[in-house]
Curated annotation (Swiss-Prot):
Zinc is among the record's keywords: no
Name recorded for this polypeptide: 2,3-bisphosphoglycerate-dependent phosphoglycerate mutase
GO biological process: gluconeogenesis; glycolytic process
Record's keyword annotation contains Isomerase: yes
Species for this entry: Verminephrobacter eiseniae (strain EF01-2)
Amino acid sequence: MHQLVLIRHGESTWNLENRFTGWTDVPLTPTGVSQALSAGRLLKAEGYMFDLACTSVLQRAIHTLWHVLDEMDCSWLPVVGDWRLNERHYGALQGLNKADMARQYGADQVLLWRRSYDTPPPALAVSDPRCERNDRRYAGVPAVPLTECLKDTVARVLPFWTQVIAPAIVSGKRVVLVAHGNSIRALVKYLDRIAEADIVGLNIPNAIPLVYELDANLSPIRHYYLGDADAAAQAAAAVAAQGQA
């Protein structure tokens, strides 16, 4: 049996302010740091060990990983950072308050933008100062997106799974992935074969380790959140409520 551990980053400043974040590189809050440290302590207490860590190129995920590994006494662990694990790009919504958008456009429209499979938000203009196309961390990216739906996020996350994560697991490595709500949703959709119409109901809470037990073909045997299951469910429900006016 193989294991894979998925962790969404700890609370960020824009999580706290209920803003669409996407590719905007915002830091963790003190609560987010505490959440990451708690995740690391929990993993250590439960006896987890890793051989490879994967994360995005956004600091809220990178720093969450650092805190997790530090608490596990394995800051030396090899880390693969890749833009393909970034959060879904929220286009022109980035920086805007979710509740304000729900009041302006309606909760149903905001839910589509946040959680549907194939409805992207309005695109960010190339001339917009928020556009990441001049950010040197993306110099090697063929086409930096101006907006994404979850379908687009799946299209970049799955090649990373195929090229990096799956071969590492098959070779016997224990992998931890620290990323974002939607890049993790993309991977979970693939692993659990969740239908496009059902993915709207999936919410990933901050900094609670999600463990997947996989068979020899990397098909899930079961998955579960470490720690208090009720607390994880409440945290996921809080994420779902962020788009309400």
